[in-house]
């Protein structure tokens, strides 16, 4: 077993023992996707530390434990259609693709250099998810509606365009807060009557979601 694979298994076992990874589908995705393929070369040795890592351009790849929390509360299954807001490195989109299928994943990124970085990483790793260049605060109406919208940057609030692009009984998962430096992880479930039920999953810190309906630069 290579050192990277050994480190990956150790981290996944730790995430499982601490309760971050709860389901087989999330565990299998973590085992399948190599985080080292989605980070800059100078960070490769830190691929399986449970910490956020800079990918450049003011952006980060989240800590594996935070990613696991978000994926678990998203309740993903094969065949669900997912929009990811904030492609970043592409790692999270690859994990979602393992759980839902490549053809069911759309991911959107607004920073040109990050868009190219994430797209290159995903294609090199063999994933054919749809990568869109654009403002994630507007969602991506063209391929809507979605069963899940997963937001990987901090939003000042839940944006109406996301609500309008979710299926009945679908879910929006997002870190939300009125301050740039602290958020709560929220899950909004759309009820049959069209209203949303909000469930809080604790505090977190993400880079700001910049866009027309998000934070300003």
Model segments located where?
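Conserved nucleotide-cofactor-binding alpha/beta core module
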Residues: 75-196
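Extracellular beta-propeller repeat domains
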Residues: 60, 152, 172-174, 178, ...
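Class I SAM-dependent transferase core
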Residues: 1-83, 87, 91-99, 114-125, ...
